[in-house]
Amino acid sequence: MSFFAPRNKKTEQEAKKSIPWVELYRPKTLDQVSSQESTVQVLKKTLLSNNLPHMLFYGSPGTGKTSTILALSRELFGPQLMKSRVLELNASDERGISIIREKVKSFAKTTVTNKVDGYPCPPFKIIILDEADSMTQDAQAALRRTMESYARITRFCLICNYMTRIIDPLSSRCSKYRFKPLDNENMVKRLEFIAADQAVSMEPGVVNALVECSGGDMRKAITFLQSAANLHQGTPITISSVEELAGAVPYNIIRSLLDTAYTKNVSNIETLSRDVAAEGYSTGIILSQLHDVLLKEETLSSPVKYKIFMKLSEVDKRLNDGADETLQLLDLLSSISVVC
């Protein structure tokens, strides 16, 4: 076939396969947003009144912050006006003072007139600043002035993981909405729906492993599911595949680390620490998983757990400062053997 010959358009099914599942199953309406009932209820009332304030969405990653404001914008303006009425800047965009003064300001000051039947189309635009907590304080200060100057025709939605990193003059001008981590039940239902829709077969316990490895981050869980489905291509997804894709340490290794520490045999502790490090497992991830297992360890008293968790935090701090991972794991296990 000639290079310049006309190509057949992708079928709807082929186009669907090429879209990342995170985007394919992103909520399109506020009703589809899961586990954020109070926030959705308040936003629905603003739809009826057309009186939308500046907003600050904060909470853990993958809880639906960006999806919620996009769904709200879609219900306000409809798909036709989304491009002209909504400006989204995320972490991949430069958001220094120059961008705030030029791109954001030029979009904010343009007036709006056109409407679409069937949608409220209030007389303002929406500017979405994703991961606003990564903006410099100077850029945030410049944004404050822009928010004040164009409040009549523009609404801002700041999205962040940590509200404390937003300067007070900016956060005080916004209505704040906390997005809580998704509960396991809703995550399981959504993942099972996606797996059924994509005709993906899974071994028992895989969905729970996805929830566990993602730590309440729905976006991460869906990405792991798609990666595992691509890896297996028709064969059932296994728990070990999910753990490997997520970079998680298998439970039997975590259990072995604790059991060896309980024996108080220094030689065995040193050997196992070196073996685990040689396997390439991240000590930071091991700390996180040890913490979760120790929380449920019924054989340990609260004072003992307290001492271990204090040591965990100390080792975590050293790792962040660049300390050797093998030595830190050895130090942690030795400390556990002493206090138990």
Swiss-Prot record:
It holds the Pfam family Rep_fac_C. Changing T66N: Normal growth. GO terms for biological process: DNA repair; DNA strand elongation involved in mitotic DNA replication; DNA-templated DNA replication; mitotic DNA replication checkpoint signaling; mitotic DNA replication leading strand elongation; UV-damage excision repair. GO terms for cellular component: chromatin; Ctf18 RFC-like complex; cytosol; DNA replication factor C complex; Elg1 RFC-like complex; nucleus; Rad17 RFC-like complex. It comes from the Eukaryota. Keywords: ATP-binding, DNA replication, DNA-binding, Nucleotide-binding, Nucleus. It is found in: Nucleus. Gene3D superfamilies: 1.10.8.60, 1.20.272.10, P-loop containing nucleotide triphosphate hydrolases. Changing G59V: Not functional. One of its GO terms (molecular function) is DNA clamp unloader activity. ATP binds at G59, S60, P61, G62, T63, G64, K65, T66. The keyword Nucleus applies. NCBIfam families: PRK00440.1 (NF001679). Heteropentamer of subunits rfc1, rfc2, rfc3, rfc4 and rfc5 that forms a complex (RFC) with PCNA in the presence of ATP. Two other complexes exist where rfc1 can be replaced by either ctf18 or elg1 to form the ctf18-RFC or the elg1-RFC complexes respectively. PANTHER family: REPLICATION FACTOR C / DNA POLYMERASE III GAMMA-TAU SUBUNIT, REPLICATION FACTOR C SUBUNIT 4. The elongation of primed DNA templates by DNA polymerase delta and epsilon requires the action of the accessory proteins PCNA and activator 1. Subunit 2 binds ATP and single-stranded DNA. Belongs to the activator 1 small subunits family. This is Replication factor C subunit 2. It comes from Schizosaccharomyces pombe (strain 972 / ATCC 24843) (Fission yeast).
